[in-house]
Amino acid sequence: MALGGTVNAQTASPQANDPHVISDQDMELLRKDIRSQKKQLMAANLKLTDAEATKFWPVYDRYTADLIKINDKKYGLIQEYADHWGTMTDEQASSFLRQWLDVDIAIAQLRQKYAPEVAQVLNGRKTATFFQLDRRISMMIDLQWASKLPIVQAQE
């Protein structure tokens, strides 16, 4: 998975004309590619039997569909943050923080919702492995985004 990179808390403003800024269409293609790679990574690490796979992948697909909805909000927040960076008021910063925390809570609640369902189709170790991989992949993606976005305080 091409998710590696260095971590820098950037302080420069995101540039709208920067050739490295990704378009909405390119973002959607990137997200689809990540989802495909994630599924391949899950398959390689879970080593499911045919019987497990038959039961697990439909649950995984429902989980992923629900996660996409939450991630749509997350990527909308990232875009909004980039659009307002440098002009963000205290009120906007507080609103951004509340919305970001709501996204984090929604992801945790989604995992809690699906944990018993996954546990019905996989044993305990494979269930734990699935959620561990899911969380690690999400953290790697979040770290990639965090390293590219300037911090709020830097706009002063």
Q: Where are the regions that the model predicts?
A:
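Sec/Tat signal peptide C-region and signal peptidase I cleavage site
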Residues: 3-9
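Hydrophobic transmembrane signal anchors and adjacent membrane-proximal interface regions, especially
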Residues: 9, 36-38, 141
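Amphipathic, charged alpha-helical segments and their helix-to-coil junctions
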Residues: 13-19, 26-29, 33, 108-156
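Amphipathic alpha-helical segments
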Residues: 20, 24-28, 38-121
